[in-house]
Curated annotation (Swiss-Prot):
Upper taxonomic lineage: Bacteria, Thermotogati, Deinococcota, Deinococci, Thermales
Pfam families: Ribosomal_L20 (PF00453)
GO biological process terms on file: ribosomal large subunit assembly; translation
Protein name: Large ribosomal subunit protein bL20
Alphabetized PROSITE patterns for the sequence: RIBOSOMAL_L20 (PS00937)
Presence of keyword Membrane: no
Source organism of this protein record: Thermus thermophilus (strain ATCC 27634 / DSM 579 / HB8)
Length: 118
């Protein structure tokens, strides 16, 4: 009786990996070994960039808030300090959204921050 090798299991595993590697260039989509290496790297990049995305968005919001503040004669750090003194708790995401979509409301917040500064 011949020895049973991992025929079905291996084929399933290889098909799964190659299916995930569809669209990759050259051997990276055809060779199991290359596909597995590439998928491993892709997973690492995806993990790192999920963390990175949070930092990138925060930076974008701060840039937008700063630009809008400077139109009203205030810089970002003074504005945030004024908001904290005034007891206004709005996160940076919403502040950036207000600065872009509702400039009048943002101007009101800037005035309140200025007033709280003294």
């Amino acid at each position: 009786m011949p020895r049973a090798k991992t025929g079905v299991v291996r084929r399933r595993k290889h098909k799964k990996i190659l299916k995930l590697a569809k669209g990759y260039w050259g051997l990276r989509s055809k060779s199991f070994r290359k596909a597995r290496e590439t998928l491993f790297a892709a997973g690492n990049y995806a993990y790192a960039h999920r963390k990175r995305r949070k930092r990138d968005f925060r930076r974008l919001w701060i840039v937008r808030i700063n630009a809008a503040c400077r139109q009203h004669g205030l810089n970002y750090s003074t504005f945030i300090h004024g908001l904290k003194k005034a007891g206004i708790e709005v996160d940076r995401k919403n502040l950036a959204d207000l600065a872009v979509r509702e400039p009048q409301v943002f101007a009101e917040l800037v005035e309140r921050a200025k007033a709280a500064q003294g």
